[in-house]
């Protein structure tokens, strides 16, 4: 067994783990970071995400004359997020985030060389205006992938001189504690089976959520909400809840609010899946007709994206069959169809400004043709009768 001593052990190489390790290194600490994935996929889901985030009271909002404030954002969150006023930790977290996201997220990222697109979007406003009351959704220029690669670069620079140890393809199987404090962890090299004994006066678990496991998601699904008959995985497959249960079983950690997940209603299988069950999330076209399995428009209230994603998920999950359709013409698709994530937004990801502006103005025919060629779930026909035949053949 190999032994390794550090000032800090970080379990999980996603965005939270990388930032935690980076800040510790800059404070003069030595860090051991353990991650299950390969070096090429270092960064977790952040490497593949689109890169939108809700931020409060930023300089960009002020420039756009958006009248936001921590008090206003907290009121929106408490109302739309249905936070229990007596629930201590969710209330404390929400308050801290709205009061510090401008400095500790927006300003901090700017200092790291990360750039935002010059627009702030109003999403999740609620079906009747009960959600976000002002625009808060900031978008990264370069997507989350660019940000993640930049922070990894900074991490390696801060860890030069031997202060940073990166253990890829390692899985933590045990947490150790001494005198009531976590004092280390046992990690397994998943390629060789070799064990590594990590010791540190501080251990940070940054292992993501539970949505990488369908079993864990279903186990925690709120009983008062319709559960979908089939699901795809748009999270990270290693965010499977194992370490949550390990911390609970070995150390008495409390797992709360696990059923409050953020899911999406309009997914389809990835044409070239990175892992079993890998799904892509479309940004539903507002001008499309959202149909059930019989080809009937779901209603009477239409399903429209950008207002209440949580409600969309419940409406789709309550349908008789586990699939729905978006019906639209090519013109609408070229102007409105989009897929969330860095992989299918290369104009933004690769910061190709002119190409991005061209596709925004003239339509993204490239993406529509790409999906037509690659995905059997993206059906194109010259007539409604021909399209109906293809839809019936698929289901």
Q: Where would I find each of the regions flagged by the language model?
A:
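Conserved Rossmann-like nucleotide-cofactor binding loop
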Residues: 16, 39, 296
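Glycine-rich FAD pyrophosphate-binding loop
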Residues: 26-47
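Gly/Ala-rich phosphate-binding loop of Rossmann-like dinucleotide-binding domains
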Residues: 21, 25
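Conserved redox-cofactor binding core of oxidoreductases
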Residues: 42, 94-196, 214-217, 268-269
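Glycine-rich loop(s) and the adjacent beta-strand/alpha-helix scaffold that form part
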Residues: 194, 198-268
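An anion/pyrophosphate-binding glycine-rich loop and adjacent beta-alpha core
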Residues: 253-394
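Beta1/beta-strand and adjacent pyrophosphate-binding region of the FAD-binding site
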Residues: 2-16, 32
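Glycine-rich active-site loop/strand segments that organize a redox cofactor
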Residues: 52-98
């Amino acid at each position: 067994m190999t032994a390794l001593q550090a000032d800090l052990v970080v379990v999980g190489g996603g965005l939270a783990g990388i930032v935690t390790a980076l800040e510790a290194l800059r404070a003069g600490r030595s860090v051991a970071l353990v991650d299950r994935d390969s070096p090429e996929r270092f960064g977790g889901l952040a490497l593949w995400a689109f890169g939108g985030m809700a931020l409060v009271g930023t300089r960009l909002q002020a420039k756009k004359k958006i009248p936001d404030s921590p008090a206003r954002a907290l009121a929106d969150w408490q109302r739309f997020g249905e936070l229990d006023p007596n629930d201590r930790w969710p209330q404390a977290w929400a308050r801290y985030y709205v009061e510090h996201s401008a400095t500790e997220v927006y300003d901090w990222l700017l200092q790291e060389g990360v750039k935002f697109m010059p627009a702030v979007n109003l999403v999740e406003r609620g079906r009747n205006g009960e959600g976000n009351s002002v625009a808060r959704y900031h978008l990264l220029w370069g997507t989350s992938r660019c940000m993640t690669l930049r922070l990894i670069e900074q991490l390696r620079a801060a860890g030069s001189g031997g202060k940073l140890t990166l253990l890829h393809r390692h899985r933590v199987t045990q947490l150790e504690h001494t005198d009531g404090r976590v004092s280390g962890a046992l990690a397994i090299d998943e390629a060789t089976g070799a064990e590594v004994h990590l010791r540190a006066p501080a251990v940070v678990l940054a292992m993501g959520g539970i949505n990488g496991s369908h079993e864990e998601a279903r186990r925690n699904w709120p009983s008062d909400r319709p559960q979908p008959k089939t699901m795809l995985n748009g999270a990270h497959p290693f965010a499977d809840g194992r370490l949550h249960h390990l911390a609970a079983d070995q150390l008495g950690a409390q797992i709360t609010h696990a059923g409050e997940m953020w899911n999406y209603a309009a997914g389809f299988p990835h044409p070239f899946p990175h892992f079993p069950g890998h799904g892509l999330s479309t940004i539903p076209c507002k001008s499309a007709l959202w149909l059930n399995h019989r080809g009937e428009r779901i209603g009477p209230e239409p399903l429209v994206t950008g207002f209440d994603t949580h409600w969309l998920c419940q409406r789709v999950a309550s349908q008789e069959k586990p699939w729905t359709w978006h019906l639209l013409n090519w013109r609408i698709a070229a102007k409105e169809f989009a897929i969330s994530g860095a992989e299918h937004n290369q104009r933004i990801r690769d910061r190709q400004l002119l190409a991005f502006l061209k596709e925004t103005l003239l339509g993204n025919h490239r993406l529509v043709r790409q999906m037509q060629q690659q995905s059997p779930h993206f059906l194109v026909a010259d007539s409604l009768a021909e399209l109906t035949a293809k839809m019936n053949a698929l289901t």
